[in-house]
Amino acid sequence: MPRAKSSVVSRKRHKKILKLAKGYRGAKSKLYRIANQQVMKSLVYAYRDRKARKRDFRKLWITRINAAARMNGISYSRLMNGLKLAGVDINRKMLADMAVNDAQAFGRLVEIAKAKL
């Protein structure tokens, strides 16, 4: 039985990795072994940062809500507690959007929260 050569498979694998490494600087986009290391590391970063993105956005929303709440004379924690007691079920993403784009409606929510405290 003849020896099975892996040239086609290897070339496909190399091309796939080098295609993923496009845009990297220097040897990281030219040499297979170095490109492969960088692509693997990049995929690890991508996985990690997809998880971190959720935390980052939640922090951003809380910061925006807190700033808008303090402009209306109440702290973030008291606002959230007041909204919970009032039965207002609105998430932080929507609250932050409202704080930035519709200050009047956010002010009404603050009044509702203050009334329930």
Swiss-Prot record:
GO terms for molecular function: rRNA binding; structural constituent of ribosome. CDD domains: Ribosomal_L20 (cd07026). InterPro entries: Ribosomal_bL20 (IPR005813), RIBOSOMAL_L20_CS (IPR049946), Ribosomal_protein_bL20_C (IPR035566). One of its GO terms (cellular component) is ribosome. One of its GO terms (biological process) is translation. Keywords: Ribonucleoprotein, Ribosomal protein, RNA-binding, rRNA-binding. Transmembrane segments: none annotated. PANTHER family: 39S RIBOSOMAL PROTEIN L20. This is Large ribosomal subunit protein bL20. It comes from Pelotomaculum thermopropionicum (strain DSM 13744 / JCM 10971 / SI). The lineage of its organism: Bacteria, Bacillati, Bacillota, Clostridia, Eubacteriales.
